[in-house]
Amino acid sequence: MDQDFFDTVKNYFRTKYIVFEFKNYSDRITQKEIFTTEKYLYEKALRKVAIIISRSGADAHALWAAKGSLRENGKLILCLSDQDLVEMLDMKDRGELPAEFLSAMLDDLLMHLEK
């Protein structure tokens, strides 16, 4: 079993726990939801990583806020949509590892993180 994503967040983000938040909104989540989730992330409690799952994913402002949280506070917030979950299930059906989807998402975020 590939643990690359989980090993990465454990070792590089120094976290033991991942906060999962589910938003059943018909619209994309906004920066408001990112800022709210960010408040749950606390280094001393060993939780610096969150995954927000929502029906339609995140809007551009939410993604910008998630990048800002990572850049300024070292808090990782990934946003998944229903379609992302379907893709992860399809990966599992094909014998692939769904965690690779999360690894690719993390790599993309880190490679495009501005100063």
What positions do the PLM features span?
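Mixed-charge (Asp/Glu-Lys/Arg
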Residues: 1-115
